[in-house]
Amino acid sequence: MKYKDLRDFLVQLEQRGDLKRVDIEVDPHLEMTEICDRLLKQAGPAVLFERPAGHTIPVLGNLFGTPERVALGMGQTSVSALREVGKLLAYLKEPDPPKGLRDAWEKLPVLKQVLNMAPKQLASAPCQEIIWEGADVDLGKLPIQTCWPGDVAPLITWGLTVTRGPHKSRQNLGIYRQQVIAPNKVIMRWLAHRGGALDYRDFCQIYPGQPYPVAVALGADPATILGAVTPVPDSLSEYQFAGLLRGAKTEVVKCLTHDLQVPASAEIVLEGYIHPDEMAVEGPYGDHTGYYNEQETFPVFTIERITMRRNPIYHSTYTGKPPDEPAILGVALNEVFVPLLQKQFTEITDFYLPPEGCSYRLAVVSMKKQYPGHAKRVMFGIWSFLRQFMYTKFIIVTDDDIDIRDWKEVVWAMTTRVDPVRDTLIVENTPIDYLDFASPVSGLGSKMGLDATNKWPGETTREWGCPIEMDAAVKTRIDHLWQQLPF
């Protein structure tokens, strides 16, 4: 699906019957979460709440509530087609040298397309049609959701945070939740390894005590949003990648407050600064684990201007016990990860992040085993390859005869090919999501790998079992007889 901006995307979804409008009053406090949660569990449509209680700005929910809509947002017609996106990223991450002149000519269009997708800066943009500044800056005018009964305050969930580090020419885009603590202040919850936090840390080291420019875009086009959660190579900006997905350059405009560039078609933009001496305790909030998280201290983002389109749309979501929207995103992005991993580890035949595993905490891998101990090499490789897998707690590795997307097959491999002492790998004192309260120390815990492959000589001294399989000729004969049998 090709589209210009979020509004164009919504028009096309509505034409497909994949967006429904709600014209009765619904409260952003809890009620929208309950409706979106039920819709998501039914693989239902995106929803536009046209009359949020106490507000005039409509709320968009459940936009990425099915893997198919994620694929459409990435410019593809099906979830399986996302493998092609992964192949492109794998090539851009580590391009192979051309094997000859013909191969070089065949690769030239791809490289040319990437170079041609540098963002296009506009002098003026729809996202700056309306400007709030000074005393007019009031987050209370926006229909920001409170998702769960125990949440401490309204929470911005789909904010596309724009930062730039002092050592980088390109900007970083990231999705970080933001707790509202005042009409012009939110808490910026970014974990230490995320791009925005790293940019901020580098800035503070070079310019100690100086305010750090930040912008948050709400209601950007889907390609730009999804570019921020995809493992884009460091040599490629998220804006460039969004252009590749969309098939057209990402249009940006300079903020009115500082020099950061934001998506020109964004519905709402928050502009301001983080002051290094201002921190606040964030949470508790219900999150993607299905629990309320611990409180933690993060920087405060002070908003100096809010700009927006005429008749803006506020894009929101909730996180909770899987499945939620992040889990659905994980299902779709899983198809992007497979070619990336296969480029680095050619023995991998499939890779699966079960949505019940809180998006990334459990991974199952199938492989063509080549030597004793091979499964452990794959485990360590996955943990260290992409930042997205830094917090993966459990990795199960099977042979390629197992359909790892069928849990019955995985359990069979685990119960018949695993000796707990020999085949369990425990790694202590590794980075863990601080939301994981099961770890003994916040942000630091252990990981476990389970080798559920057939064991080779050197891994066992016993004769290994041979799987039962019916004679092929008998199966063929019964296939022909089946329609004649009385069942």
Swiss-Prot record:
Keywords carried by this UniProt record: Cell membrane, Decarboxylase, Flavoprotein, FMN, Lyase, Manganese, Membrane, Metal-binding, Ubiquinone biosynthesis
GO cellular component term, pick one: cytosol
Binding site for Mn(2+): 172, 238
Catalytic reaction annotation: a 4-hydroxy-3-(all-trans-polyprenyl)benzoate + H(+) = a 2-(all-trans-polyprenyl)phenol + CO2
A Pfam family: UbiD
Catalytic residues identified in the record: 287
Subcellular location: Cell membrane
Source species, domain of life: Bacteria
Membrane topology field: Peripheral membrane protein
Manganese is among the record's keywords: yes
The EC number(s) this enzyme carries: 4.1.1.98
Main localization of the protein described in the UniProt heading: membrane
Metabolic or biological pathway, per its Swiss-Prot or TrEMBL entry: Cofactor biosynthesis; ubiquinone biosynthesis
Uppermost EC category: lyase
Single annotated GO MF: 3-octaprenyl-4-hydroxybenzoate carboxy-lyase activity
Record-listed prenylated FMN binding positions: 175-177, 189-191, 194-195
Cofactor (UniProt): prenylated FMN; Mn(2+)
Cofactor: how and how many bound: Binds 1 prenylated FMN per subunit.
Family the UniProt entry places it in: Belongs to the UbiD family.
HAMAP family given in the database record: UbiD
Assembly mode: Homohexamer.
Role, per record: Catalyzes the decarboxylation of 3-octaprenyl-4-hydroxy benzoate to 2-octaprenylphenol, an intermediate step in ubiquinone biosynthesis.
Protein name, as recorded: 3-octaprenyl-4-hydroxybenzoate carboxy-lyase
Organism for this UniProt entry: Nitrosomonas europaea (strain ATCC 19718 / CIP 103999 / KCTC 2705 / NBRC 14298)
